């Protein structure tokens, strides 16, 4: 199995759900669920990169998880993880998986797939995708879509429906035309630790700013991103109070199995 570490960015001041890492799910802080998922995936190290002591305190019961106290001024989770990598002292070739702090149901196989996508290829960065199941999802700008080349590398990420099925969508946009599998991006990433520092130092790209998608910075700079298909369903993350309510229902359903 590929050796890897997991870093979880956990910022307290989330705009749509303030204090998100400490919101309770099943009676426990959200960040605790995410950290356990990383441990279950077999990570050699699990770090939480945060700017708030309350989040660090919430993790005190998990001895296997380390906490990096990072600057509150970081503009993105990538910047926060780059500081975490420096604190942890990881070698440049270390495989680092960036597991978002709002993914309490991230499957272990999906986390491992991101790490494995970096091994044996030329891409310094990897991510996950899954199949789009319906037209509503494809046309939703809050759902990021992507297209891959024959090497399973990302060609582009967009909030728009890509690829555009000219004839099929001319007939109807209510159903997906047959004969093409659209891909939905899952926001989990893998990097070599050295490239993580390089990524964080890059200036924002024009496409990144237009789409508000940080990963486009890497493509614009000419670097490939390997895209693996998630081997298991990857439930959506938590961004809003409504998402948290749905997660509570899902957690109860999983416990009842």
UniProtKB/Swiss-Prot annotation:
Its main location: cytoplasm. Its EC number is 2.7.7.38. SUPFAM superfamilies: Nucleotide-diphospho-sugar transferases (SSF53448). Pathway: Nucleotide-sugar biosynthesis; CMP-3-deoxy-D-manno-octulosonate biosynthesis; CMP-3-deoxy-D-manno-octulosonate from 3-deoxy-D-manno-octulosonate and CTP: step 1/1; Bacterial outer membrane biogenesis; lipopolysaccharide biosynthesis. Keywords: Cytoplasm, Lipopolysaccharide biosynthesis, Nucleotidyltransferase, Transferase. HAMAP family: KdsB. This is 3-deoxy-manno-octulosonate cytidylyltransferase. It comes from Stenotrophomonas maltophilia (strain R551-3). The lineage of its organism: Bacteria, Pseudomonadati, Pseudomonadota, Gammaproteobacteria, Lysobacterales. The gene is kdsB.
């Amino acid at each position: 199995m590929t050796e890897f570490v997991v870093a979880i960015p956990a910022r307290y001041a989330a705009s749509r759900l303030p204090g998100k890492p400490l919101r309770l799910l099943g009676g426990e802080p959200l960040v605790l669920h995410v950290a356990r998922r990383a441990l279950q995936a077999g990570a050699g190290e699990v770090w939480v990169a945060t700017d708030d002591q309350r989040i660090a305190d919430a993790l005190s019961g998990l001895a296997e998880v380390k906490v990096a106290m990072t600057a509150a001024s970081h503009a993105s989770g990538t910047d926060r993880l780059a500081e975490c990598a420096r604190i942890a002292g990881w070698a440049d070739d270390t495989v680092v998986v960036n597991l978002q702090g709002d993914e309490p149901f991230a499957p272990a196989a999906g986390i491992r797939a991101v790490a494995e996508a970096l091994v044996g290829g030329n891409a310094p960065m990897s991510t996950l995708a899954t199949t789009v199941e319906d037209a509503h999802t494809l046309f939703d700008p809050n759902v990021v879509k992507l297209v891959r080349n024959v090497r399973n590398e990302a060609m582009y990420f967009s909030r728009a429906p890509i690829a555009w099925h000219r004839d099929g969508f001319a007939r109807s946009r209510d159903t997906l035309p047959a004969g093409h599998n659209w891909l939905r991006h899952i926001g989990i990433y893998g990097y070599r630790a050295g490239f993580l520092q390089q990524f964080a130092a890059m200036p924002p790209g024009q496409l990144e700013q237009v789409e508000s998608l940080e990963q486009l910075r890497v493509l614009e700079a000419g670097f490939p991103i390997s895209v693996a298909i998630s081997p298991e369903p990857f439930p959506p993350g938590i961004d809003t109070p409504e998402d948290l309510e749905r997660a509570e229902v899902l957690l109860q359903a999983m416990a009842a199995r």
